[in-house]
């Protein structure tokens, strides 16, 4: 069983939101990204026009108050349509783990240190603290962003405790009965 995860949290003070206020083009993530709109903020985060939301035939994706895509794990069936539509490749399908709750990095920002923090308040700064403390050795930093192999994560959450930016979150799986209950509600809409 798979489900989609968006590797971005964004913030209410995101530079992208401010820049979108002066953008007068089509309200599409793909068009916004294709135009090469220059950003002084995170150029790897969710653009927030909801192309993924429109692509999801199950209504599993919404935009939160920060205009960042969020997937409802109880409604997502793991079809993968959203993964192909995101121009910044923020959405991935994650396989269900044997562990009830694993750790996941909700960031895709490739900037480091201060530059990363200036771009977004919820960023991974690539400090590698999580790599050093992981007892399962399932974390690596690639392009200045920590990546956790959820198939090897045991859910100890040691990495969450040492992350100075709070970029690592628990990824819980919804039980099949709850998924069916929520899917029934979606079908009624």
Cite the ranges covered by each PLM segment.
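Strongly charged, low-complexity linkers/loops
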Residues: 129, 135-147
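Ferredoxin-type iron-sulfur electron-transfer modules and their immediate structural context
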Residues: 1-69, 73-75, 80-133, 162, ...
């Amino acid at each position: 069983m798979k489900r989609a995860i968006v590797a971005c949290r964004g913030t209410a003070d995101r530079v992208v939101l401010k820049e979108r206020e002066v953008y007068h083009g089509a309200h599409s993530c793909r068009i916004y990204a294709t135009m090469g709109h220059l950003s002084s903020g995170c150029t790897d985060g969710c653009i927030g026009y909801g192309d993924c939301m429109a692509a999801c035939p199950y209504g599993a994706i919404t935009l939160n108050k920060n205009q960042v895509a969020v997937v409802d794990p109880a409604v997502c069936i793991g079809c993968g349509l959203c993964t192909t539509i995101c121009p910044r490749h923020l959405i991935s399908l994650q396989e269900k783990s044997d562990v009830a709750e694993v750790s996941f990095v909700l960031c895709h920002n490739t900037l480091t240190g201060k530059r990363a923090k200036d771009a977004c308040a919820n960023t991974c700064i690539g400090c590698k603290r999580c790599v050093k403390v992981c007892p399962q050795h399932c974390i690596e930093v690639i392009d200045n962003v920590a990546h956790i192999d959820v198939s090897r994560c045991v859910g100890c959450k040691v990495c969450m405790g040492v992350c100075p930016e709070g970029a690592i979150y628990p990824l819980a799986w919804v039980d099949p009965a709850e998924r069916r209950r929520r899917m029934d509600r979606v079908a009624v809409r």
